[in-house]
C-alpha cells in the first residue's frame, strides 16, 4: 500500500498579515519554524521520499524533516501554490490588500483565464494536481511525505473526493467552495493511500 502524507507549510509572513514581495519567496515566521520542528516529532518511521514545492516556505518547512532523515532522498516537485493573480501586480501587497482582486477573479469563474504574466489559469492548476497524483502512483517509493500549500492540497483532495468529469465554470466554483470549507491549517494536511491494483486514491485527515 502506498502512503503519502501531504503537509501544508508552516506559518508564513503572508499568513501573519505581512506584505510579500512575491508568491515564491515568502518566508516562514518564527512560529512557522517551530511548527516545522514539531512535524518531525510526529514521524514514527522514516519516509522513503521527501518532496517539497519550490516555494521558500514549503522548502523551509521540509528542511526540518530533511535534517532529521538526512539519508532519505529529497526532491522538489511542481506542487507550488496556485498563483492566479499576476505576480507583478501583487508585489509588496498584503492578503487584505489583494482581497478585491481575489473576489473579482473568482466571480469571473473562467477556468481558462490567466490574470497576466506569471499567473496560471485554474485549468493549469488542476492539471498540476492531476500530474502530482499520477507521479505519486508511478513512483516506486511506498511511503512519501510532500510539503505543499493549502490550495494545492485541497485541489488534490477535491480531485479524489469529487472526481470531476470536466474542469468547467461549475467545477471551478465547486472547488472554491470546497477550499473555503476545508481550510488546511499550517503544518496539517491529508494522508493519501493507494492500494495495489487500485486506480482510485483514498484520503483522510492527517494529524501533524
Regions found by a protein language model. Give the residues of each.
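Acidic, low-complexity terminal tails and accessory targeting/binding regions
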Residues: 2, 71, 82-96, 158-208
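Phosphate-handling substructures
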Residues: 27, 66-130
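Glycine-rich phosphate-binding loop signature in dinucleotide/nucleotide-binding domains
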Residues: 43-46, 136-142
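Conserved histidine-centered catalytic loops in small-molecule metabolism enzymes
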Residues: 44-78, 100-108, 184-208
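Short beta-strand scaffold positions
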Residues: 52-53, 127, 147-148
Amino acid at each position: 500500500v502506498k502512503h503519502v502524507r501531504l503537509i501544508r507549510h508552516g506559518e508564513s509572513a503572508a499568513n501573519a498579515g505581512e506584505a510579500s514581495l512575491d508568491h515564491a519567496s515568502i518566508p516562514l515566521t518564527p512560529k512557522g519554524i517551530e511548527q516545522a520542528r514539531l512535524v518531525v516529532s510526529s514521524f514514527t518511521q522514516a519516509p522513503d521520499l521527501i518532496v517539497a514545492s519550490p516555494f521558500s516556505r514549503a522548502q523551509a518547512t521540509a528542511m526540518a524533516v530533511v535534517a532529521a532523515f538526512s539519508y532519505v532522498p529529497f526532491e522538489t516537485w511542481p506542487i507550488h501554490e496556485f498563483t492566479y493573480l499576476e505576480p507583478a501586480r501583487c508585489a509588496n501587497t498584503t492578503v487584505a490588500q489583494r482581497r478585491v482582486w481575489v473576489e473579482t477573479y473568482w466571480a469571473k469563474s473562467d477556468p481558462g483565464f490567466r490574470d497576466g504574466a506569471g499567473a496560471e489559469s485554474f485549468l493549469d492548476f488542476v492539471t498540476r494536481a492531476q500530474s502530482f497524483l499520477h507521479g505519486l502512483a508511478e513512483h516506486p517509493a511506498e511511503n512519501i511525505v510532500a510539503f505543499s500549500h493549502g490550495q494545492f492540497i485541497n485541489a488534490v483532495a477535491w480531485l479524489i473526493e469529487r472526481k470531476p468529469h470536466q474542469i468547467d465554470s461549475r467545477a471551478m466554483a465547486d472547488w472554491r467552495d470546497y477550499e473555503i470549507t476545508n481550510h488546511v491549517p499550517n503544518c496539517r494536511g491529508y494522508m493519501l493511500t493507494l492500494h495495489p491494483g487500485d486506480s482510485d486514491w483514498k484520503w483522510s485527515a492527517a494529524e501533524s
